[in-house]
Amino acid sequence: VVLQNPAGQLSGLADTVADEIAFDLINQGMAEGLIQKRVEEVATQMGLIEQLNLRPESLSGGQIQRLAIATAIAANPAVLIMDDPTSQMDPLGRRQFFQWLAQVKETTVFIVTSEIDDLCEVADVVWVLHEGQMVAQGRPGEVFNHLAADWQIPAPTIQQLAQKMDWHLADGRYPVNDADLKEVRYVHN
């Protein structure tokens, strides 16, 4: 689990970023050599390799979010739940996170986010909750082409552009991500 407030997820016992990433691995009884290797792998994935010897509290908000993600993925979980994991990241950090997320294949990831454009690029399935009820579920293109006004969810930027330009996919839907945009059929008046 990656919490919306990443500082609340950290152990508070670690002297360094490396120690924080290693914390759960040590508690699981992993061999020391394997721990060091895994810490370096995860730190590289999260862009924290240069911060491994720093104190966790010296990191920026975005770096702390990446550290929280690193601690969550260190043990290779089968399922990962993340609550707004990019809320404190700068645009570059967000882009790097979603690029990393697009590479994740062996882990089922549930992510709560308002980063609609990024979500449309990486999500296989989107669920929409409204007033505590699931009101939609499906592939991003299916869900975002059938948004209800009272859900107060903005359409992805690509979809908004496509609507203004009257660009459609072969099935009549508007594109919602880069891959869809490449399949656009132009409608001429």
PLM regions: where:
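Conserved H-loop
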Residues: T107-V112, E115-E121
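Conserved ABC ATPase signature
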Residues: R55-L59, Q63
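Catalytic Walker B motif of ABC-type/P-loop ATPase nucleotide-binding domains
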Residues: L80-D83
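Conserved ABC ATPase "signature" region
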Residues: A22, G33-Q51
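Conserved beta-strand-loop-alpha-helix hinge in the C-terminal portion
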Residues: Q133-I158
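Conserved catalytic motifs of ABC-family nucleotide-binding domains
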Residues: N76
